Amino acid sequence: MKTKTFLAAFLAALMLSAGGAVAQEECPRGTLDERYCDRDGDLLADTPTDPAELVDPDTLIFAYTPVEDPAVYKEAWSDFLDYMEEVTGKDVVFFPVQSNAAQIEAMRSGRLHIAGFNTGSNPLAVNCAGFNPFTIMASLDGNFGYEMEIITYPGSGIETVEDIRGGVLAFTSPTSNSGFKAPSAILASEFDMVAGRDFEAVFSGKHDNSILGVANKDYPAAAIANSVLSRMISREVIQADDVVSIYKSQTFPTTGFGTAYNLVPELRANIEKAFFTFEWEGTSLQREFEKSNEGQFLEMTYKEFWDVIRKIDAANGVSYACE
């Protein structure tokens, strides 16, 4: 009897194990973290099929990528978030974040539901935190994106990129596309210049820190996003002639907006509706972002729009593993 009982238990365990292996095989995920699946091949974490894994919070938390003073953007987003409250029937709270890493961790841990992640952080947010981006800001004629520029100050003695050799170049943070990853790849491929060998790299933390650092002559040169530079000049934080551009890249997609992967589908649909039906005219959002010629939310797919960014990451040996 004991032998039969043991055998039955063994066979049951074997079947469960086999079932688990099949389930594992039926959950393709590419570079996504092991907690996510990507059965439709869009490179994004799928919505959970188990209702118990879906969330429908009473209060939605929104965070915008950590550039410049968070207080500025709390005000800038206020009219939009009021509209989102109307559309979703939920309270919506602006959550100021101080770093890309903190923003990603907040979404991974379930404390952040809607976000705008900067260009370089999007792939890590997608793969590690289950971020599902679906829109970016664009101009009214449908153009979108920004360029990475390397800037210096007048009279610095730096007139070309090669003049940075033997000197210092300020980056923003390791997760930033225009503030680190793109310039690193471009410097290596176009100029045979590598940080630590040909110049000293320092990190300022944010684009506005780098821009102010150059304008105040604390940094001889910096790699920055020109969309941030344009807004700072428009707000007269610096004057246009405080800095000089010595390099301008191809156009990259700008901040990607989206939701956590596990919100209930009806809520996610209403959040998307809020983005695509928001009337910009006369709002706090328009007042801030018209400075960089943005005036609408444009539908996009991460798989297509972030292809160039993933290629830059691959060239830099970037891993999307959660740390």
Tell me what each language-model feature is.
Residues 21-102, 286-323:
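N-terminal hydrophobic or amphipathic helices and topogenic motifs
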